[in-house]
């Protein structure tokens, strides 16, 4: 007798869950990402008067935005890398990479809110958040191209 489709689907789902839950990623592999997270937090909490002044030409090329892109690209990628190197199924890796990119963008928004309300001489800048989100997107695209080719 044939099994109902939902029962077969449920069994497949259960098998996938079992196989992926058997994959463990050591917490210590996330230490670089955690350290970078706190470095970014310290940097965004610097009062405005303690920041170096930007030369005229650096301002013209939006140097501060490129700093944001770099900081958040590295942040997202450091959290993605342990998952990308794991033995998780590729669909799960991709799911986690997307979630990390979204979380990184949300963290960028959160840092702007922290600056506006808690850091003297700093303010909320939508373009900083855009640069942070671009950094997360770059990490996501790099991960997709380099690690998730299938």
Residue ranges and their predicted role:
Residues 2-121, 126-129, 133-150:
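Bulky hydrophobic segments
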């Amino acid at each position: 007798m044939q099994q109902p489709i939902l029962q077969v689907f449920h069994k497949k789902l259960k098998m996938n869950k079992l196989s992926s839950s058997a994959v463990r990623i050591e917490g210590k592999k996330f230490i670089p990402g955690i350290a970078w997270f706190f470095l970014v937090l310290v940097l965004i909490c610097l009062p405005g008067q303690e920041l170096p002044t930007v030369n005229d030409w650096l301002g013209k090329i939006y140097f501060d935005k490129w700093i944001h892109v770099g900081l958040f690209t590295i942040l997202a990628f450091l959290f993605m890398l342990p998952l990308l190197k794991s033995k998780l199924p590729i669909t799960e890796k991709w799911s986690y990479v997307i979630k990390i990119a979204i979380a990184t963008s949300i963290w960028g928004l959160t840092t702007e809110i922290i600056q506006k309300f808690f850091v003297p001489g700093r303010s909320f800048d939508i373009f900083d958040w855009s640069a942070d989100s671009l950094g997360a997107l770059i990490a996501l695209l790099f991960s997709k191209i380099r690690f998730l080719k299938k």
